[in-house]
C-alpha cells in the first residue's frame, strides 16, 4: 500500500478505496429508530452484506485495494492515550448530558480492544451493555425506554460523505445532521494516527469542528488544479 493520500481526479484509475461492510448497526433500525437515524425503510442485513461483498469483489478483480473503516480506525487507536481522547470526543458528539452515563460509556469502551471498541461504537452502545447506571439527568430519564445511549451509525456505508480526498490532503467533514457527525471522527483519527495515512506531507483542508457543514458528495476533484464544490441542502457556507 502506498502511504498517504493521492487523489487528483474523480475519473482516473482507482488504486485504493475505503469501505464499510454493513453490520449490526443495520439491525438497530426499527420503526421507532428509523427517523432519528435518517432511514425511511429497514434494510435486510444479509442482503446488504451480499450486495456489498459483490461490489467489493468487482473492485478487487479490477486491481483496487479495498480497505475497511473498522480495521483502519482500530490501527489508529493502538495507543491508550489516543483511545481515551477518541472516546471522550465520541461522547461529546453524542450529546450525553449525564456525567454518570458519560463515565459508564467511557469505562465500557475503554475496557475493549481497539477493533472491538470501533465495532461497538459503529453498532451503537446499548443501555444493556452498561448495566445499572445512576444518572441525575432528566433528559436521560425521559429517554430511558430508548435502547441506545450512544446511537449506531447505520449510514456509515455511505463512505463518501464523511470526508473527501483532495490531492495530497483531505477534508474531514462537519456533517449536516447530528446523527451522522460522529462518522467523521473515525476518519479524523484514521488520518491523524493510522500509519498508512498519517504521513508528514499530508494536508487537512477542513475539519469536523469547523463551523459550516460540508459532505463528500458535494466535493469533486476535477484535476490537479481544480475542485468543484456543490451548494446543496447539506452544505452550508
Q: What spans do the regions from the language model cover?
A:
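The feature marks the mature, well-folded catalytic cores of soluble enzymes
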Residues: 1-235
Amino acid at each position: 500500500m502506498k502511504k498517504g493520500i493521492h487523489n487528483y481526479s474523480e475519473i482516473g484509475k482507482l488504486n485504493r478505496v475505503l469501505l464499510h461492510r454493513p453490520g449490526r448497526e443495520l439491525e438497530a433500525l426499527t420503526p421507532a429508530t428509523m427517523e432519528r437515524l435518517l432511514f425511511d425503510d429497514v434494510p435486510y442485513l444479509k442482503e446488504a452484506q451480499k450486495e456489498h461483498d459483490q461490489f467489493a469483489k468487482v473492485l478487487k478483480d479490477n486491481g483496487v485495494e479495498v480497505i475497511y473503516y473498522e480495521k483502519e480506525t482500530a490501527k489508529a487507536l493502538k495507543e491508550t492515550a489516543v483511545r481515551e481522547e477518541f472516546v471522550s470526543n465520541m461522547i461529546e458528539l453524542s450529546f450525553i448530558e449525564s456525567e454518570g452515563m458519560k463515565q459508564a460509556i467511557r469505562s465500557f469502551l475503554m475496557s475493549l480492544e481497539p477493533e472491538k471498541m470501533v465495532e461497538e461504537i459503529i453498532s451503537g452502545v446499548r443501555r444493556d451493555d452498561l448495566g445499572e447506571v445512576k444518572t441525575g439527568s432528566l433528559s436521560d430519564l425521559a429517554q430511558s425506554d430508548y435502547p441506545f445511549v450512544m446511537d449506531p451509525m447505520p449510514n456509515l456505508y455511505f463512505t463518501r460523505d464523511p470526508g473527501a480526498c483532495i490531492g495530497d490532503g483531505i477534508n474531514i467533514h462537519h456533517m449536516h445532521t447530528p446523527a451522522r457527525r460522529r462518522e467523521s471522527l473515525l476518519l479524523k483519527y484514521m488520518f491523524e494516527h493510522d500509519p498508512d495515512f498519517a504521513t508528514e506531507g499530508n494536508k487537512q483542508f477542513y475539519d469536523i469542528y469547523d463551523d459550516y457543514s460540508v459532505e463528500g458528495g458535494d466535493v469533486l476533484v476535477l484535476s490537479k488544479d481544480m475542485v468543484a464544490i456543490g451548494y446543496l441542502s447539506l452544505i452550508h457556507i
